Amino acid sequence: MPVGNLTDQWFFLCGVDVLAPSDALGVVALGDSLTDGNISTIDAFCRWPDQLARRLVARAGRPVGVMNNGLGGNRILHDIRGDSGLRRFDCDVLAQPGVTHVIVMLGTNDPRNRWAKPEEEVTAEHMIAGLSDGHTRQLHDAPDSVLLSAF
């Protein structure tokens, strides 16, 4: 068999379903590169969702799973390197089986506009309105939610 090349990318993995007891906690971390672990040590499992998982497992008294749905460059309002956080919410949170909680950590890339078009400039008011309006519509069907600011 030929020797393969190591990579730190997940080219083909789009999800993993597991059987879990009915009382299990299922947490989705929806965010940008800070959630994805862009500056974390590769394969060290030190990203904040990894650390959260360890703490929850130690304290919850029941099975816990934390799904890291961080996407580098992701923004709240506008698509870049994939759908915006608001557009991803349905498929990356609501469509996932067994989710009981969601943590949303988005916003660092919206005001920076490095990759954006001039018409996609946003203010803090735009971001707050986007999260408030978008999540008000989506959260009525969602699990318990926690919104985190990246600032």
Region spans (language model):
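Active-site metal-binding loops of divalent metal-dependent hydrolases
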Residues: 32-34, 71, 108
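General small-molecule cofactor/ligand-binding pocket signal
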Residues: 67-69
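Alpha-helical cap/lid subdomain in secreted, periplasmic
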Residues: 43, 50, 54-62, 74, ...
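N-terminal secretory targeting modules
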Residues: 1-30, 35-44, 58-61
